[in-house]
Amino acid sequence: MLFSDFYFLMIGATISMVGMLFHGIVGQKKYMGIINQSDLEPLTKSLSLIAWHMFTIFLFGSAFTLAYVAYFPNYSIAAYPIIAVNLFGAFLFIFLGLGKHKHLLKMPGAYLMGITALFAWLGIS
């Protein structure tokens, strides 16, 4: 593994970790504030919270996996699912944003997921 490969993977891991902290703390407070003030049923509000934090957990898993691969490059195959999910997530944000959900293009999700996929790929290629 090249010196730069380690740093590419660690940049991807850092983006995911910072994203996880922001999403899990700041984003959750803002999002759940809006959801809790809505007329949604309590079960829907609870499921919304679960869905929100499933993505937070995904960000943690991405950060952990990319950092692990940076230190143990023999396990670089573990980065491929992280690259794929981040890439498909970025495409989903863009696809929906180009349709009826234009506000998604103003959110950082597509860009951060795309950049994470790029740095992870650079780190293992």
Q: Which role fits each region the language model picked out?
A:
Residues 1-5, 35-43:
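Helix-boundary and loop/linker segments of multi-pass membrane transporters
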Residues 39-47, 66-77, 93-99:
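Short juxtamembrane and helix-loop transition motifs at transmembrane-helix boundaries
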Residues 72-73, 91-107, 120-125:
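Membrane-helix boundary connector in multi-pass membrane proteins
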Residues 55-56, 79-93, 111-117:
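Hydrophobic alpha-helical membrane segments
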Residues 47, 109-124:
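Small-residue-rich segments of transmembrane alpha-helices in multi-pass membrane proteins
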Residues 3-6, 77-81, 101-112:
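Non-cytosolic membrane-interface motifs at loop->transmembrane helix junctions
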Residues 14, 18-30, 43-71, 83-88:
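Core segments of alpha-helical transmembrane spans in multipass integral membrane proteins
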Residues 1-13, 66-78, 120-125:
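Helix-coil boundary and interhelical linker segments in multi-pass alpha-helical membrane proteins
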